[in-house]
């Protein structure tokens, strides 16, 4: 038991480090493009930032299921180690050149890196907690929290490294990928291999599952919101000194000191993690379907809160703080969608064979939505700056609410077990 706990702790820690590195890399891309724009090197802009983000998500989309199948047919540990090493190569490439083709190659390789880690890791965690639903629920919660912690620290790490080391920051982030690869090699052992036909059978079963098909379009909308806000476009808009539409409070807010943007990301991620933790304690009583509805609906007043602050103009700081605190409380509520959707998906998955293949669906849904969100962020960011991100979020939240009508209120049979 102690060995298993140590193995799980080491592997989840490696996931946190990978998320720090991935988040830091995305933020560094935005900061690097701002530098190139200021130096009049190339034609970098919000559209470029959004397209680069989309290219990484596209690569993750294309490779998630094949690499999940590979993890079913081979030891997941070595698939994950290879993915972490590829991430180190990818992030190092970006800081070595001003060539846009290399930029896109770097982001594609980093997307493949994520695809080589996430489905195999989820499959490995499911295998290590086989037969113990309570342990699986705790471990999957820790997986989400390690992801959030990584995202929180990644923005801070990127801005601090950029402030002190500039282009060398990419090399330091690559070291993080190497450290994660070492931890995976040491701790992510175990997990048997499965015949290739079993892996493909598991994939076919998951793809045919009616609950998964009904959830997919709603989850795509929510993941597109993720792509809107976590791609390079937000960093570009907040830190670019040349942002037009100065009537918007958030445009170029941290142009003079980009390191402040990292602290904002840290605060937001900690707030999000607090919300996820709270939902894990009440989700069983609220119900999975109702939790998804509540979370989607809450996105609308959250956007209203950001809009009011963005256009507060000469309003007092007390007004901004009041709106900001109310918006923060609403963000706690909207965080319930991810644990609810994961519980829904967990109840639909067929655990007998092909865990990596089935878990690849999670990454595919994330990637497809995030691609659309990142492209939407670049387009709307060029048109409306920060307001464009709010507009995109409102449109996606409304679409998600409409699509929820297709999802039955009764959750899949196993969902309730995973959240106890």
Predicted segments, located by residue:
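Conserved MFS/SLC helix-loop-helix module at the cytosolic interface between two early adjacent transmembrane helices
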Residues: 61-97
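A late C-terminal transmembrane helix in Major Facilitator Superfamily
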Residues: 354-382
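Symmetry-related core transmembrane helices of the 12-TM Major Facilitator Superfamily/SLC fold
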Residues: 168-185, 389-405
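Central cavity-lining transmembrane alpha-helices of secondary-active solute carriers
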Residues: 51-68, 266-278
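C-terminal ends and interior cores of transmembrane alpha-helices
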Residues: 85-98, 298-316
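Helix-loop boundary and gating motifs at the non-cytosolic
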Residues: 2-57, 213-214, 218, 223-248
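Cytoplasmic helix-loop-helix junction between adjacent transmembrane helices
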Residues: 106-145
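Juxtamembrane intracellular "pre-TM" segments in multi-pass secondary transporters
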Residues: 1-5, 188-218, 420
